[in-house]
Amino acid sequence: MDQPQTLNEMALQGRERLFPSLTNPNWLVLRERRKIFARWLAQLPMRELDVLDVGGRVQPYRELMANRIRRYIGVDVQVTPLVDAVARAEQLPLGDATFDLVICTQVLQYIAEPSLVFAEIRRVLKPGGALLLSVPSAGLIDGVEERWRFLPAGLRYLLADFGIVEVVAEGSSVVGLFRTLNVCLDLFARLPAARFIYRRSLAPLVNLSGALAEKISGGRNQQFAVNYSVLAKK
């Protein structure tokens, strides 16, 4: 799919990630990520934030801290109107200890050496600064460049140089099951017309069924969590 090129197109895409519609096959995990990130952001002590968005071509989570931003820098390998610096995450063209917060969502699965990215993020964070991260642990392959899936123990190992690391599943195994069902059915609806019909008929039903099943189950089992959010503090 072509990347959005206008601010309006990117705003729509970012809004869909932050406040996904019921027709979105990823609705279950995206809404959980928003709640997790909002909670962590509320816990940060800084009144004003210097923010770096690694992979920030769309910047969906910028709205969560809109009233606290002092400076917001987007870095990506692709040019968009929101990107301030075109660079790889392994080589950030930024000074040491210059950011209170780094955001990096659904990027690391494409990086050959994630440890290099974490080292760079830690370098540019101020003492006491925080990283908000999201990564997949299961799901469809999204293009030929994907290399990795991540689990809690592996994430803690990669982030061992950070002082505090909290890993939270974006929903339980129940969410993982219903989200996987939704994205697989969406994949099989190959024709645009079939996908349009699916997303406006069955996809909302699968999403709502997953949310209800999650509530009934209590969300305790996380063996099939399909995505994780991470808070790491320097």
Language model segments and positions:
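Surface-exposed loop/turn positions
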Residues: 49, 96-98, 128-129
